[in-house]
UniProtKB/Swiss-Prot annotation:
GO terms for cellular component: cytoplasm. Coiled coil: none annotated. Gene3D superfamilies: Phosphate transport system protein phou homolog 2, domain 2. The keyword Transferase does not apply. Homodimer. This is Phosphate-specific transport system accessory protein PhoU homolog 2. GO terms for biological process: intracellular phosphate ion homeostasis; negative regulation of phosphate metabolic process; negative regulation of phosphate transmembrane transport; phosphate ion transport. Pfam families: PhoU. Belongs to the PhoU family.
Amino acid sequence: MNRLLNEKVEEFKKGVLKAGWFIEKMFRNSISSLVERNESLAREVIADEEVVDQMEVEIQEKAMEVLGLFSPIGKPLLTVTAGIRVAELIENIADKCHDIAKNVLELMEEPPLKPLEDIPAMANQTSEMLKFALRMFADVNVEKSFEVCRMDSKVDDLYEKVREELLLYMMESPKYVKRALLLLEIAGNIEIIADYATNIVEVSVYMVQGEAYKCYHDELLLFKKSGGVLFESSD
């Protein structure tokens, strides 16, 4: 029974990771479509959102199968519940990649506003965060999990730099407003994807340690308050 349960949990986990690797590629393609002004790549990203939606459904079904047939406890239960949450975050990332690709198509209707520097830098950092987060979930090794908070802080700083620069463009001339707003929305979506990558790491830490940790600025700290909000503390 335990052997079969472990096999099913491992199969479930591999499915979550396949969805994660797919979303890594989807994110890279969304940014490449922006940098290269590649319409076909942007449309591919938009179409890929439905693939991720289907993946999430399959992951949920597999999770219900494992929970229903085996009623796991302990580590297997934590792995399945963590996988469900990671799949939700992957689907959220797919939504943001879809939004980036749609913005790219709109941007391509006009000449480039400016050379792209900080937005690709944000994207590169976020791509590293995604890779890092999925490796944490895959390896069940969260020793360096705190590093994701520092990476996220760098993305936040780059976003502020992009926002300030684009606001200057909007104040300079009305003809720049639409393109600046589209670029600002893209930067905002990249920043949100970085937050989702951070959430994946937080979920992985909970899966391994059984306690909730959250990023506060560039530190990963235990998230614990006295008493409860919905339920009384079991301490």
